Amino acid sequence: MNRFAILTFWLLACLPAWASEGGDEWWQEKTDTERALEVNPGELEFLAEPPEGPVHHHDNRITITEASLASGWIGLRQCHQHLDPVGRAQIVFGEGRIRALRVTASENIERAWVEGASVQLEGVRSDARLCIEAESRALHAQDDGYLLKNGPYMRRFLDGYFPMHVTMTVEAPEGLQLASVEPERQPGFRVWREDGRYHLDAWFEGRLVTRLRLERTP
C-alpha cells in the first residue's frame, strides 16, 4: 500500500517542496507507540549529537557578488544526499524567486528534469544524490547592510518532523562581514569563518529559519 508523504524544505525565500509517493515501508513496520515517541510536531530542536545512520543532508553553496548587492539575486549550488527512496518526487521553488534552474548531477535516481520552477524526480533509490544550480532572489538590502534569510528548512513526513542536516557556505565580496546570526550559536548549530567564506552547520528536528546579517566594514 502506498501513502503520500511530504518532505518540505524552504531555501532562500524560495519554496523547494520535496513531495514523494511510496517507499514508506520502514514507517509502516513501526508500532503506533514507537511512531508517537519519534515524531517531532515541528518545534525546532538542535541535536548536539548527530543521529545514527544516514540523515538527509541538504548542502548549499551561495555566491554573493557586487551585482547581487544591487539586484538581490545570488548564485546557488545545492546538493541533496541520502534522499528517502520513493517512486516519484519533486522539489518546487517559489515562482519569480528562482531562475536559470538546472540539474547538474544525480545518482541512484532513474530520471531527473527541470519543469518550470521545479525539479521532477522518478525512481529515487537508496543513497540517492541530486545536485542543482540556479540563481535565487534571496538577498535583501537594509539600512545597515544586507539580510540573507534562509528557511524554514524541514524534513517532514506525514504529521511529523524528522532529523535533518543542513550545511551552507557563503562567499561574499571583500569588505562585507557577518554582523549577526539567528538562531544563536549552540550545540548542533555552528557558524564560523574560514578561508574567506562563512560556513553554517546545523543538525536539527523541526523547522529551521536562519538569518545572516551582513554589513560593510569601515
Regions found by a protein language model. Give the residues of each.
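Bacterial N-terminal signal peptides
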Residues: 6-16
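N-terminal, polar/Ser/Thr-rich
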Residues: 20-67
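Solvent-exposed beta-hairpin/edge-strand motifs
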Residues: 28, 39-42, 85-114, 160-188
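Short, solvent-exposed beta-strand/turn "edge" segments of beta-rich domains on protein surfaces
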Residues: 51-53, 62-73, 90-92, 121-125, ...
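Short beta-strand elements of extracellular/lumenal beta-sandwich folds
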Residues: 68-85, 150
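Intrinsic-disorder/low-complexity, polar/charged segments enriched in Ser/Thr/Lys/Arg/Asp/Glu/Gln
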Residues: 73-77, 86-88, 127-131, 163-167, ...
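A surface-exposed beta-strand-loop module
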Residues: 100-148, 195-217
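Surface-exposed, acidic/Ser/Thr-rich flexible loop segments
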Residues: 117-189
